[in-house]
Design a protein with these regions (language model features):
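Flavin (primarily FAD) cofactor-binding/catalytic cores of flavoenzymes
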Residues: 2-43, 88-189, 193-201, 205-429
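Dinucleotide-binding Rossmann-like beta1-alpha1 core, especially the glycine-rich loop
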Residues: 44-45, 50-65, 80-106
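Flavin (FAD/FMN) cofactor-binding and adjacent substrate-gating region
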Residues: 49-82, 235-256
Length: 429
């Protein structure tokens, strides 16, 4: 009976949780290595949910998903569609989302679109449970859940219902805010582009409230082919021009070896909020911009509006608005990775004040067999992991780590656990 159950539910070498750019890239490399990965998630879900009219901030040549043969890059998809993906010409986010779907159909095994609700330790390695209650057994797991679990909303706004406060990532379309007074919180690309789109979608009034003392804009990128002196002075990278960006882009492994305090400081300061060069003209429709301001309190008024207490350079003020959109980014905190079993989560070593999971060589966490990809690894590997560009560095190395861990497990059994882990977590062999 036990043998029959084991055959019906074999132990998988690798389960990939998440089907965004990182999850799909990891699955493509794993499939090419013969690991037969199982991948869960709706392909490019967060990208499909973005409002129409948004554009990629990154250059097309820095926006490839990763497969080992480099056969399914964004340039290949664009060529197949008769689209010119050129340096300095922004591409619609919808085009990039469709590219991810195309990549999924060609480079990875069939994607199981169910949501994984739990990854827990088990004798074989891990038990992976889906939304409908099915549990798979896996020797290794790659957690590539993207950014949506890590939404950051300013503290004074968190207690308000979603009817009054949303994160910018909640909006597939902005038509529902037409005719309303909307306050957008933040000064980065998401805030500035959301505000511009709201103005174009017929919002009655749009304002920006941001702690930043000024708006920062990226400059028009220089030509790809330049003279040797210009190239030497400010080399192109997938994260923008300049030698600092080149180090972030080309050497995430070196970033990981920096002292923890240095990594934390750079993570907080590198590639800070800025609008794309092509957005600046569109943003001209937004005239109410309040910089150097922070929200200290928020409440719903008797006439169904939101009252914001705001502190700024000239003292305190009160704003009333119909809706608040928090375009305030994401925090890669382990506490927000709810898909991980609580006991497993508490056993992981962390880095930085936000308690991101420590990510070791080849993207393995401190729990053997649990691998991490994407935003969760940025405090360890640097700012490139906040962007699609980082998938190219991650995918092949992570799969190399999986293969190494499987060999270390020996004989196809469990990959092992931290010392004392079985007893501490109540896992029975």
């Amino acid at each position: 009976m036990a043998n029959a159950m084991a055959k019906a539910n074999p132990v998988r070498d690798l389960v990939v949780v998440g089907a965004g750019p990182y999850g799909l890239s990891v699955a493509a490399h794993a499939a090419a290595r013969g690991l037969g990965p199982v991948i869960f998630g709706r392909p490019m879900e967060s990208w499909h949910a973005m409002p129409s009219g948004m554009f990629l901030k990154s250059e097309p040549w820095a926006s490839h998903l990763s497969d080992p043969a480099r056969a399914y890059g964004l340039d290949a998809y664009a060529a197949a569609r008769g689209v010119r993906a050129e340096h300095g010409v922004p591409l619609p986010v919808s085009f990039f989302a469709a590219y991810g779907d195309w990549f999924a159909r060609r480079a990875v095994p069939a994607v199981d679109e169910r949501t994984v609700v739990s990854v827990a330790p088990a004798p074989e390695g891990f038990a992976v449970t889906t939304e409908d209650g099915e549990t798979l057994r896996a020797r290794t797991v790659a957690l590539a859940v993207g950014v949506l679990p890590f939404l950051e909303v300013p503290g004074p706004l968190r207690h308000l219902p979603r009817r009054y406060v949303t994160h910018s990532s909640h909006h597939g379309e902005l038509d529902g805010l037409a005719g309303r007074d909307v306050t957008v919180v933040g000064a980065g690309q998401a805030a500035l582009e959301t505000a511009a789109l709201l103005a174009g979608a017929g919002a009655a009034a749009v304002r920006i409230v941001a702690r930043a003392d000024r708006l920062r804009w990226n400059t028009l990128p220089p030509a790809l082919r330049r003279g040797p002196w210009a190239t030497l002075r400010a080399p192109h990278t997938g994260l923008g021009c300049g030698w600092t960006n080149k180090l972030y882009a080309d050497a995430p492994g070196a970033f990981r070896r920096l002292p923890a305090t240095t990594r934390a400081r750079l993570f907080d300061s590198a590639l800070g909020p800025a609008g794309a060069w092509w957005l600046r003209e569109r943003f001209g429709a937004v005239t109410d911009v309040r910089l150097g301001h922070r929200i200290t309190a928020a409440a719903v008024t008797g006439d169904d509006r939101v009252r914001l207490d705001v502190e700024g350079p000239d003292g305190t003020a009160v704003l009333e608005t119909d809706h608040v959109v928090a375009a305030t980014g994401f925090v890669p905190s382990l506490d927000r990775a709810g898909v991980l079993d609580p006991a497993l989560r508490s056993a992981l070593r962390t880095v930085g004040p936000a308690r991101a999971p420590e990510t070791g060589a080849l993207f393995e966490s401190s729990w053997p067999g649990l691998f991490l990809a994407g935003l969760l690894t940025a405090p360890s590997y640097g700012p490139s992991m906040r962007f699609v560009f980082g998938a190219g560095y991650t995918a092949g190395r992570l799969v190399r780590g999986v293969r190494r861990r499987l060999r270390a497990g020996g004989g196809g059994g469990a990959v092992g656990r931290p010392r004392g882990g079985e007893r501490a977590l109540g896992v029975r062999a």
